[in-house]
């Protein structure tokens, strides 16, 4: 499949006694912080509500992203599976509303800001470079990847698929058609 990053895959493996493995990183989908009302992070008022994903890996990722941008500080050693309870410093007393990933786009209307992937922002006609208050830097562990069962990851069919999706033609297609939502994660 192509819909998960390696940390989400590992959480799936742990929770389902599964053995999925990353075959090939495919593209980066960086989180962004979007607001319907505010145009910069400095405009986001004290006590504003920020919608974040409620599943463990994406919540942790969203909080790590906000920490990297200086919005909050997490307890030392929190790691990627942080929760709202791990927030140590929150200078503007933001409130964090945890919602299902599929609700984040709707929260664009209801919350002061929403942490979303480009795939959720695009249907709202939002792009990271023009509309996001903040955009996550690409992180290899979060690249959407071709994933397979461990027992067939090296099969000829899977390897042909990996080769096809990382071709120069696919790279060019992604760069030309999805520059802000699917930057190639392969060379």
Residue ranges and their predicted role:
Residues 1-10, 100-101, 109-111, 116-122:
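Beta->alpha turn/N-cap motifs
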Residues 4, 58-62, 154-157, 161, ...:
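Stable alpha-helical elements in mature extracytoplasmic
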Residues 11-23, 38, 110, 115, ...:
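Ligand-binding "clamshell"
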Residues 19-72, 171:
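A conserved helix-loop-strand patch within extracytoplasmic ligand-binding domains
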Residues 25-35, 60-67, 122-163, 165-187:
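Periplasmic-binding protein-like
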Residues 61-97:
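Ligand-binding cleft/hinge of the Venus flytrap
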